Design a protein with these regions (language model features):
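Short acidic/polar capping segments at secondary-structure boundaries
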Residues: 110-112, 126-128, 139-141, 172-173
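Active-site/ligand-binding-proximal alpha/beta "capping" segment
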Residues: 92-127, 134, 185-191
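Flexible, glycine/proline-enriched loop segments at strand-loop-helix junctions
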Residues: 107-108, 132-136, 163-166
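A cross-family phosphate/adenosyl-ligand binding-site feature
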Residues: 1-100, 138-178, 182-196
Length: 196
């Protein structure tokens, strides 16, 4: 089992039209706090980011936000967090969130969320970490991505073991249970000539 003290959550800073996404963010934030796990996220106070952080804070949870200085005003940096760390770039934000987190959950979001998810999954594929990476699939939001991952694996462009680096869950409870039950993977880092 993986010792989980902090979970990094990727999600949108926009306000979605579907209230189920907001509800899922609130439920996840609340559950992370109830399980006495630190929430690490992008530091915004709007959209799903704000819902997530506010729910964790309302439950008395520890919340660390990581936000680039240039986005502080645009994403309306959350000033009520346990800790808000300003960084100089998006890359530094992702690296610090990675360093602070023992696992990752992706809620619905836009291109930034997709990019953060892809980067931590790629780092796992390269053998740089074995931290769990989980999709919280709210009402089928991530179905097209799951289908694309399956298509890439079926086409031989993604090894089956690497396809399974991103796990799909359908509730906050399931996401955190999958993370808690995860075992560090002892994977090969590279494809051999025989496997080509």
């Amino acid at each position: 089992m993986v010792a989980v003290h902090a979970v990094g959550v990727f999600c949108g800073s926009s306000v979605p039209g579907d209230p189920r996404y907001r509800d899922a963010a609130r439920v996840l934030g609340d559950l992370i706090a109830r399980r006495k796990v630190t929430l690490v996220y992008g530091g915004g106070s709007t959209g799903l980011m704000g819902e997530l952080a506010d729910a964790a804070l309302a439950r008395g949870g520890r919340v660390i936000g990581v936000i680039p200085a240039g986005l502080f005003a645009r994403e309306v940096g959350h000033t009520g967090l346990t800790e808000l760390r300003e960084v100089t770039s998006m890359h530094e934000r992702k690296k610090l969130m990675y360093d602070l987190s023992d696992a990752f959950v992706a809620l619905p979001g836009g291109l930034g969320t997709l990019e953060e998810l892809a980067e931590v999954a790629t780092w796992s594929q390269l053998g740089l970490h074995s931290k769990p990476v989980v999709l919280l699939d709210v009402d089928g939001f991530w179905e097209p991505l799951v289908a694309q991952l399956d298509r890439m694996a079926g086409a031989g462009l993604l090894k089956p073991a690497n396809r399974n680096l991103i796990q799909r869950t359908r509730s906050a409870d399931e996401a955190l249970d999958v993370i808690a039950a995860a075992r560090p993977a002892g994977r090969k880092k590279w494809i051999t000539a025989e496997e080509r």
